[in-house]
Amino acid sequence: MNIGRAIKVTQAVVDIKFEGELPKIFNALKSKLKYKDKELVLEVSQHIGDNIVRCIAMDSTDGMSRGDEFVDTGAPISVPIGRSTLGRIFNVVGELIDECGPLKGKYNLEPIHRAPPSFTEQRIQEEVLVTGIKVIDLLAPYLKGGKIGLFGGAGVGKTVLIMELINNIAKAHKGFSVFAGVGERTREGNDLYHEMITSNVININEHEKSQAVLVYGQMNEPPGARARVALTALTMAEYFRDRENQDVLFFVDNIFRFTQAGSEISALLGRIPSAVGYQPTLATDMGAMQERIASTTSGSITSVQAIYVPADDLTDPAPATTFSHLDATTVLSRQIAEMGIYPAVDPLDSTSQSLSAEIIGEEHYNVASEVKRILQTYKSLQDIIAILGMDELSDEDKIIVDRARKIQKFLSQPFHVAEIFTGMPGKFVSLSDTVSSFKGIVEGKYDHLPEAAFYMVGNIDEAIKKAELIQAEAK
């Protein structure tokens, strides 16, 4: 047993002196004493000479003192993987924090530091991941194994969108989801857990029937936990991709806090900061995690990463480094939410690299381009409408405005996870239905239908039925 003693404690950074063999970089050290009834786990970060290793604490160092003994585990932090993790909440070191008893069933332990898939393992076929959400599938489609940035303020429906994606992936693709709460508010994490129980994404009576795993490193935890919790969650997601051949959804909220935690650690380790005070290894840290999110010959991990932009400055090194890894962006707009259109995705601001004829096909590409053109024209005409009114527009512009308003309404959709709040049954719309429905609208086939018929429906057949009901009620 290789035992070392603490010789210096500086908040989240601890120096440990070993008499025998030095532990390797990234090895986990466990305390022999318990602090607040828990073992403290440290991760070796630097060898600084004189048989001393500098470590990052994964929990609070309150109550620790010089001379306390730590045991080298001989391996990196290792966390449970397997189906038994479904429906449970873990912390950064793989301990359960949901107070629902121990893990049931088989599971293995895997280290959180792993190499990304090799070139030969990676799948180069570009395949669209159908989410069943019209606005995403039509205008900013997700690729299997892609990375999506989710931008949205408080109260615009980010959590509901995340939960609907989890629900649809589970039902349509029989896939699982892993959620990493990085620097989350504890209240938000608690709310998400209870909302998942309400919407049957998590089954607390039979955990094996759940569709998601939650891993939390909350805002009140030391930077070590916040910097590693995304890797813990990613390790659990890799199991479903590599061993169960699944298409996994991996959520990170918030990727900025992952960078922020790395910056705090870097300063405590005494590294010279780079631009705007960030760690000099910012690009390396980000790349090490993002490269593990990929499609392989076994399955795929598609990540949706919520991104906070400091002071709305997109050139800040943290969001700028993240952008270089993204394949698509989904922007939630408060203006659209205020109009009562949910999901409140901005169709003109959201982008996707897969929106090209080679990947999604000629028909889909042409329909998406025409929808964007109509919406953009409507946006540019809004000032004229506000000042002079609709009567001053040309006949052609009036038709465009009418179609744009129908498209805007048709981009709304009732969600399965919101059924209990709205009373409307949720709709999963297939990609072919989405494309053909919007094709009909832009070609003018449904110009005779009232605008209200397009609001909160699935495909165009439902809009036609709704129009018939509206006309029947009017009589």
UniProtKB/Swiss-Prot annotation:
Disulfide bonds: none annotated. It catalyses: ATP + H2O + 4 H(+)(in) = ADP + phosphate + 5 H(+)(out). SMART domains: AAA. One of its GO terms (molecular function) is proton-transporting ATP synthase activity, rotational mechanism. Coiled coil: none annotated. It is a peripheral membrane protein. Keywords: ATP synthesis, ATP-binding, Cell membrane, CF(1), Hydrogen ion transport, Ion transport, Membrane, Nucleotide-binding, Translocase, Transport. It is found in: Cell membrane. ATP binds at G152, G153, A154, G155, V156, G157, K158, T159. Pfam families: ATP-synt_ab (PF00006), ATP-synt_ab_N (PF02874), ATP-synt_VA_C (PF22919). It is an enzyme of class 7 (translocase). Its EC number is 7.1.2.2. GO terms for cellular component: plasma membrane; proton-transporting ATP synthase complex. Produces ATP from ADP in the presence of a proton gradient across the membrane. The catalytic sites are hosted primarily by the beta subunits. F-type ATPases have 2 components, CF(1) - the catalytic core - and CF(0) - the membrane proton channel. CF(1) has five subunits: alpha(3), beta(3), gamma(1), delta(1), epsilon(1). CF(0) has three main subunits: a(1), b(2) and c(9-12). The alpha and beta chains form an alternating ring which encloses part of the gamma chain. CF(1) is attached to CF(0) by a central stalk formed by the gamma and epsilon chains, while a peripheral stalk is formed by the delta and b chains. Belongs to the ATPase alpha/beta chains family. NCBIfam families: atpD (TIGR01039). This is ATP synthase subunit beta. The gene is atpD.
